[in-house]
Every structure is written in C-alpha cells, then in structure tokens.
C-alpha cells in the first residue's frame, strides 16, 4: 500500500508557522508554485506506522546476515553516521569560502592520503559518485593518456570473462572494443589467452583481484608485465579490495588506476539508489588527468585544486566535490579503525569465508574451484543437485528467506552453473555463520525429503512469487492520483 492511499483530506501532520509576507516576497514570481503539490495528507502516527511496516518487510544488514556475494554487506557503524551529521558539517555550504571550511577540507585531504597509502597509488580524487562512475573515470583517463601520446591506434580493452558487467559496459561507453579472455580451470586468467590478446591496439586490461570467483589472481605480476610491455595500462576494479586491504596494494601489483567502492570496503551505507562514492587513485603516469576538484595542503592551508591548477584534468564529474556525507563517513570509519584495525579487515573477512566454505563442504555442498583458498567469498554450485532433484540455486535462495537469511548472489558469475556466490563480511560473528550453516543443512535435508517445499519457497514472506516477465514488460514506476 502506498502512502498516498492513506491520504485523507485535511488530515494533517504537525503544523508550523506560515512564512511571513516579506519572506514570500523574496521569492521571484516565476519560481512560485501555481498549484499545491500533490502530497499525501497523513497524520504523523499513520506515517510512522506505514514506514515501520514497510521496513519490517525488508531484509537489512541491521536485522540479519546478508551474504550477498561481491557486495561486501558489512555493518555500518553508527558512530560514523552520528559524527558525519554534526551541525558543523551539515551546515557547511560547498561554495562557501575555503577559509570557512578548513576542518572539512582537512578531513577530505586526510582521506585522500589514507587511500593513497592503502592502495599504493600516487594520488586520489574523491569526486566520483559511484563505482560505475569510478570505472568511467579510470578508463577515460587511460584514453586521455594514450591520446596525449598520439597513440590513437589503441582501441581495445581486455576484460576477463569473470568480470563484473560494468567493466565491458564502461569500456564500450568510452569508445573501446572489448576483448574477452577466458578463465582457466583453476580460476585464474588464462595467461596464454592474455598473451595472444595483447597487441599494439591494446589500451588496457580491466581486472578484479581477487576475482568474482573468490580467488586471488596468482599471476597478477606476470599479467602486469605482459600488458605494460604491450604499451597498455592496468585498471583495478576495487569491488573486492576488502579481501586484501592492508595485505597487498594494487599499486604494488602493477595497477595504474583503481576505483574504491566506499559502500563495500569502507563501510558507507548500501542501496537506496545512492548516494554513493568511489574515489579513484592513479599511478604517476595518470596524475595529470585526475578529475577535479582535489584537495591540496600548502603552507598550512587546505584548498581546492581546479581547472587552473590542473589543465590536463578530464574535468568535473559531479556538481562539486561529490557526496560529501559519504566521504565523511568513510573518513571516520578508517580513523576509528586505525592502521591495525584496517589490517584485520582482510584477515577476518578471509577467515569467515574459509570457515563457512569448510562447513558447507562438510554438509555435502559442491564448491567451485575446490583446490583454492577463498579470498573473501566463494562459490557453491548446485548443478549436480539440480540434475538429481530439479532443485535449483534459485529455489535454495528463496528457501533461505524463510529461514531468516538474505539469499547469496545467485547465477553470478556466469561461468559457474547453478551457483551461489557467498560473502560473509568481517563483521559477522562465528555464531551467525553457524546459524547460517544450520539453515543450509535444513534445506539440504528438505531437498531429499520434501523437495516441493524448497521448489515453492518462500512460504513466509509478505510477497511470495514475483512475475519477473510482467515486472520487466509492464513498468509501474510513478504514482498517479487518477489511478
């Protein structure tokens, strides 16, 4: 039920004093509304009940384990929210004089420096407002680099078949042809295929490490050498940075540019359509092209670097700095952790993943790439179970909802049939992981004894089955008061 359907004429929320006439007179006539907005008329109590009921219908990291692979659904510390919402931050206008915002600029500068240090990059820009935009920035800078050298024949970007879908989309948006290379049977990029793919047309390689298969690319140094010798650059998709934070730096692996998903590794909130943030770091070769503004610290004063300071920059990617509130939350998070805490992130994330992998293997679940240690996530394949019983990965995922857990990522990566991509972030306790194992055992037993119970799940959700085809073909995105 929509909030508008609760609306009753003249049923108002709390009132406030109307604007005085002088205040109204300050608004130009062409900016004044000609008619009242179509807002619902609902009491405060009904409003609270409506949104509370909606929240109870949704899964959330605040209520239960959320093992969504390749998403790093870690807990968002409330201290980060509380400090980022201090009036001194919220009341700061982005266009206010720099000397009135030195505290905020100091936070942004220190965040740039911390991200430089943990990634091994030479400089960082915070302006990107999403992971996909961070990718676009990175490949745009690679293009600018080659064009500045007069190397216009480089028209191809190499991408492994296990990559996130945004990688090829980004390359195409930047005008490149995508060259896909396969994964070998151990889960690594096929080196012979990479060597065959590089050429004078190679602009770069986009790589996630650890990959979406949940394994660390063992030959990343050799991959870097092959691409660089061909004149290309390496792009690091930072989606899985959480697995190696503080243990190995992308810069040391040979990458020239990286984006970092703050909503994953640095614990800013997920979802809701935003706001997001994905700072971009670069090696020396791409320094001139970083998007602006960037915070500089000169003679004890913080200031923005703009087009005048960086004439080769690819320009601005957001209205101003980007999503300041998200960046503040990430800064507070890393300061709360400190250097030692940041080292433990990868340790605990990897420990949780390998513990869960071992427990599910004991139950009889088939693990993809069984000879490899999980980096931070791992893949269960249900192909054999499906062949024997007809129960699919999607069926199991739906049944997990009845057990009180959000489902893992299903059917990604596409390389593994009937797969569940499971990622327990470092913030989950052993007790939580054990409860998840119990739920998985219960479902495995149900597959043997009452498979229809699993096939027809979920049974306890407010909405049981969704018509995916109807939802895609008959979009209903805007409320209309006329019905």
Swiss-Prot record:
BP-aspect Gene Ontology terms: glycine decarboxylation via glycine cleavage system
Top EC class, one word: oxidoreductase
A Pfam family: Aminotran_5
Enzyme Commission identifier(s): 1.4.4.2
GO molecular function terms noted in the UniProt entry: glycine binding; glycine dehydrogenase (decarboxylating) activity; pyridoxal phosphate binding
Cofactor(s) annotated in UniProt: pyridoxal 5'-phosphate
Keywords in alphabetical order: Oxidoreductase, Pyridoxal phosphate
Catalytic activity line of the entry: N(6)-[(R)-lipoyl]-L-lysyl-[glycine-cleavage complex H protein] + glycine + H(+) = N(6)-[(R)-S(8)-aminomethyldihydrolipoyl]-L-lysyl-[glycine-cleavage complex H protein] + CO2
GO cellular component: cytosol; glycine cleavage complex
Location of N6-(pyridoxal phosphate)lysine modifications: 264
Domain of life: Bacteria
NCBIfam families in UniProt: PRK04366.1 (NF003346)
Family: Belongs to the GcvP family. C-terminal subunit subfamily.
Purpose: The glycine cleavage system catalyzes the degradation of glycine. The P protein binds the alpha-amino group of glycine through its pyridoxal phosphate cofactor; CO(2) is released and the remaining methylamine moiety is then transferred to the lipoamide cofactor of the H protein.
Subunit structure: The glycine cleavage system is composed of four proteins: P, T, L and H. In this organism, the P 'protein' is a heterodimer of two subunits.
Protein name: Probable glycine dehydrogenase (decarboxylating) subunit 2
Organism: Nitrosomonas eutropha (strain DSM 101675 / C91 / Nm57)
